[in-house]
């Protein structure tokens, strides 16, 4: 057993450990912690063990305790350690009471940060996290480094710990839900931007901003910070930086960071030297927002990997699933899956990547974020708007109240289901048109997450005759 794994074993052996929820990462850890000698309690809103489906058999086999139903948080009392799932609000009173009573409240990601023996690169922001995180991991891989990729991007990190060597690198996508309670920061920290998001979950915008700042606050020099220059909030984070802070910017030149030069070259300026490293025309990724993601990723790894690795990946990488992902061309109409568009800013970035007006399918779960900024972009870039979900009426109101709506010729329709939305969009399309699913909303009214939503859209589109 490696030193780090041994330290984790010493932390949990003989301890009373509560897990909030049985998501994918917690299922793996529950089994591991039982094996390490912990007394595990699973706290969950489900009413009975049978409600866990196929996992019920594992629960019975492991012999773990259960605290279920309406009062599942009663199981927090008397625990030595509580593992919080990111979706569980950190400032809920039962959890804060447990902290006051001396319980260690942590999470899978926090434990990984505590015991990881290798360098960690962390990426957060309201938009661009996953593409930037993926690019960074591919830059390191192209340079021959072994990469452990995880966090909010999908894979649990702590189970990887036995395979992590000091010379490796961990590349971690971090959400505000994960960051809000973290007390360690990565060696290299990237903040892409901060715009209103998840305000259904956070108390207010300031709590959301403070959660994002946590990626910087616990860094120990030597360290590196990469901040988006175009965003007022990320620019305000400079006083939080403890190491070598650099910018990335598409719209300005800088003598300290990565930027898009007027001649179409992506450049890095550092220590008085400007190095052009990639031509915009050679980039396969669609959209100007992806130029920003490339700049952010390059600024993060600059000096850590050869320029040739950045050039190779930058000129061949075609994107991540659900991000302006081409699905199919049918009857001369191209369908795109941009289900990652869970906020207005994401959808705006997607719309701006098209050079003609599109047919947009939008709407979903309401995160209580404003839609007024979306309205002028819809009027400028959309010819037919198909709305669904709880935010459909809010998006329609914002668009219809915009002074340019009356003269725009924009048509608005409403759909009850994704199938219905695709049918309406198809009926409105002419050869040469593009139909894009970019909801500007979360998925939770109809789907567990944006991935499931995007895959249903693709399935429906691919089954069209």
What is each model feature region?
Residues 39-47, 225-229, 361-362, 381-390:
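Short internal beta-strands
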Residues 41, 69-70, 106-110, 242-261, ...:
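Beta-strand->loop->alpha-helix junctions that form or flank phosphate-binding loops
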Residues 8-16, 26-36, 146, 277-384:
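Nucleotide phosphate-binding/pyrophosphate-handling subdomain across enzymes
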Residues 40-44, 149, 171, 247, ...:
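Short beta-strand "acidic-cap" motif of Rossmann-like dinucleotide-binding folds
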Residues 56-57, 374-432:
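C-terminal helical cap/extension that packs against the catalytic core
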Residues 33, 82, 123, 152, ...:
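Residue-level signal for inorganic ion chemistry
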């Amino acid at each position: 057993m490696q030193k780090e794994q041994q330290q984790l074993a010493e932390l949990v052996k003989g301890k009373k450990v509560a897990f909030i929820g049985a998501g994918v990462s917690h299922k793996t850890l529950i089994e591991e912690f039982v094996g390490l000698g912990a007394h595990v309690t699973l706290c969950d809103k489900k009413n009975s063990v049978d409600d866990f489906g196929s996992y019920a058999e594992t629960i019975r086999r492991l012999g773990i305790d259960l605290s279920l139903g309406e009062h599942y948080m009663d199981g927090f009392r008397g625990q030595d350690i509580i593992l919080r799932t990111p979706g569980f609000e950190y400032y809920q009173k039962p959890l804060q009471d447990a902290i006051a009573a001396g319980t260690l409240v942590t999470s899978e990601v926090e434990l990984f940060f505590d015991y990881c023996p290798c360098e960690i690169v962390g990426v957060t922001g309201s938009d661009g996290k996953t593409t930037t995180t993926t690019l960074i991991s591919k830059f390191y891989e192209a340079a021959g480094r072994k990469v452990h990729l995880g966090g909010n991007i999908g894979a649990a990190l702590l189970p990887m710990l036995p395979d992590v060597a000091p010379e490796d690198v961990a590349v971690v996508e971090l959400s505000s839900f994960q960051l809000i309670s973290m007390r360690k920061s990565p060696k290299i920290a990237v903040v892409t931007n901060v715009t209103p998001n998840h305000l259904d979950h956070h108390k207010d915008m300031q709590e959301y901003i403070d959660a994002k700042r946590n990626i910087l606050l616990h860094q120990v020099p030597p360290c590196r910070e990469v901040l988006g220059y175009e965003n007022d909030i990320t620019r305000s984070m400079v006083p939080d930086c403890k190491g070598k802070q650099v910018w990335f910017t598409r719209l300005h030149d800088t003598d300290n960071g990565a930027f898009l030069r007027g001649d179409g070259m992506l450049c890095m300026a550092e220590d008085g030297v400007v190095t052009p490293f990639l031509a915009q025309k050679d980039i396969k990724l669609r959209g100007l927002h992806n130029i920003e993601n490339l700049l952010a990723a390059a600024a993060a790894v600059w000096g850590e990997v050869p320029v040739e690795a950045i050039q190779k990946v930058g000129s061949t990488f075609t994107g991540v699933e659900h991000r302006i992902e081409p699905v199919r061309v049918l009857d001369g109409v191209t369908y795109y899956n941009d289900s990652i568009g869970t906020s207005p800013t994401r959808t705006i970035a997607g719309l701006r990547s098209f050079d003609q007006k599109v047919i947009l399918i939008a709407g979903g779960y309401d995160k209580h974020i404003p839609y007024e900024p979306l309205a002028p972009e819809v009027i400028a870039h959309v010819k037919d708007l198909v709305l669904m979900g709880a935010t459909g009426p809010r998006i329609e109101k914002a668009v219809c109240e915009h002074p340019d709506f009356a003269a725009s010729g924009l048509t608005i329709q409403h759909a009850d289901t994704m199938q219905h939305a695709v049918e309406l969009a198809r009926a409105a399309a002419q050869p040469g048109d593009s139909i894009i699913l970019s909801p500007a909303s979360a998925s939770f009214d109809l789907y567990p997450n944006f991935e499931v939503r995007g895959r249903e859209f693709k399935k429906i589109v691919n089954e069209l005759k």
